[in-house]
Swiss-Prot record:
Name of the molecule in the record: Aspartate-semialdehyde dehydrogenase
Gene behind the chain: asd
Positions annotated to bind phosphate: 118, 213
Pathway in which this enzyme or protein is active: Amino-acid biosynthesis; L-lysine biosynthesis via DAP pathway; (S)-tetrahydrodipicolinate from L-aspartate: step 2/4; Amino-acid biosynthesis; L-methionine biosynthesis via de novo pathway; L-homoserine from L-aspartate: step 2/3; Amino-acid biosynthesis; L-threonine biosynthesis; L-threonine from L-aspartate: step 2/5
Binding site for substrate: 184, 210, 243
Keywords, ordered alphabetically: Amino-acid biosynthesis, Diaminopimelate biosynthesis, Lysine biosynthesis, Methionine biosynthesis, NAD, NADP, Oxidoreductase, Threonine biosynthesis
Matches recorded under InterPro entries: ASADH-related, Asp-semialdehyde_DH_CS, Asp_semi-ald_DH_pep-lack, Asp_semialdehyde_DH, NAD(P)-bd_dom_sf, Semialdehyde_DH_NAD-bd, Semialdhyde_DH_dimer_dom
GO BP of this protein: 'de novo' L-methionine biosynthetic process; diaminopimelate biosynthetic process; lysine biosynthetic process via diaminopimelate; methionine biosynthetic process; threonine biosynthetic process
GO function terms (MF aspect): aspartate-semialdehyde dehydrogenase activity; NAD binding; NADP binding; protein dimerization activity
Length: 354
């Protein structure tokens, strides 16, 4: 290590062999702040080299410095976790409910992509560009639950896409009502989540619990932290969620009625200026909202990798006869909407609190 170089924080990944787990591996393999030293998965995978334990289906090969790492059980007392300070969780919700508290009790900071604890009143549900102050709930969580670690969550993928675009609108004009129709990529369900015969030549107008997550999480994210609790935002929100035959990239049609009234050009201006973390030099951070002027953008294949997959791409901002405005938003669902969201939360936390 060269003189003046900061020592990296050792991190681990739970659920490392799955779709989101693989994205975590990609993002952390050569990270300037974090050193990936522990990969945990099921008992079936434990003991195998990572390259043998997972069916890798990302757009780039398994990182050279990771592929021969040995997968370990999801056990916070395992020796590989001894020096790990931060753990990223890509576990399914039921397993997250069981294992994440065990890691918190061992003093680990859990940055979780799982839904298990998102709506607990003492658990921060965070998009750092939107509500970084909610991280103050960590101290309340520690006191209430009696552990030295903490669970910090990021929202559902489709929620992130919508809320990042709604935040600058709410701050300037207020929100009265929001309607969202989603067209969500199959990668959001995992590699085996949607059978090919079900999605090819088809659209599935139902994703279990997705609409409820969007509606409840949005109000918490855009709520106000007061006296140690989050007061939910006060506007009406409705979502209708669909699975479509796209590999990566959630697209959303968003309709917004504001309290003050707003024109499309005004919405475009506040979105374009929205860049609250630009001075922090966070490695994973990108400009949150990128505006496209073309009449047929954004599109998943063309726009999902904007900002290395961390930017929300917005287009077709126009007047609406029922609401005030409507627009189309696109995110890379497994990067900005999942692993990238957790990593950005961790980067922000380290920058501000460590």
């Amino acid at each position: 290590m060269s003189k003046g170089e900061k020592m990296k924080i050792k991190v681990g990944v739970l659920g490392a062999t799955g779709s989101v787990g693989q994205r975590f591996v990609q993002l952390l393999a050569d990270h300037p702040m974090f050193e990936l030293t522990a990969l945990a998965a099921s008992e079936r995978s434990a003991g195998k080299k990572y390259k043998d334990a997972c069916y890798w289906f990302q757009d780039r090969d398994i990182p050279e410095n990771i592929k021969d790492m040995v997968v370990i059980p999801t056990d916070p007392k395992h020796e590989e976790f001894e020096d790990v300070d931060i753990v990223f969780s890509a576990l399914p919700s039921d397993l997250a409910k069981k294992f994440e508290p065990e890691f918190a009790k061992e003093g680990k900071l859990i940055f979780s992509n799982a839904s298990a604890y998102r709506m607990e009143e003492d658990v921060p549900l965070v998009i750092p560009e939107v509500n970084a102050d909610h991280l103050e709930l960590i101290e309340i969580q520690r006191e209430k639950r009696g552990w030295d670690g903490a669970i910090i969550t990021n929202p559902n993928c489709s929620t992130i896409c919508a809320v990042i675009t709604l935040k600058p609108i709410m701050d300037k004009f207020g929100l009265e009502a929001v309607f969202i129709a989603t067209m969500q990529a199959v990668s959001g369900a995992g590699y085996n989540g949607v059978p090919s015969m079900a999605i090819l030549d088809n659209l599935i107008p139902f994703i279990k619990n997705e609409e409820e997550k969007m509606q409840t999480e949005s109000l918490k994210l855009l709520g106000t932290l007061k006296d140690g609790k989050v007061e939910l935002a006060n506007f009406k929100i409705s979502a209708s969620c669909n699975r479509v035959a796209v590999i990566d990239g959630h697209t959303e049609s968003i309709f917004v009625k504001t309290k003050e009234g707003a024109e499309p050009e005004e919405i475009k201006e506040v979105m374009d200026k929205f860049d609250p973390l630009k001075d922090l030099n966070l490695p994973t951070y990108a400009k949150p909202i990128v505006i496209r002027e073309e009449i047929d953008r954004p599109q998943p294949r063309l726009d999902r990798n904007e900002g290395n997959g961390m930017s929300i791409v917005v287009g077709r901002i126009r007047k609406d006869p029922i609401f005030d405005v409507k627009y189309t938003a696109l995110e890379h669902n497994t990067i900005r909407g999942a692993a990238g969201a957790s990593v950005l939360n961790a980067e922000y936390f380290v920058k501000k609190y460590i």
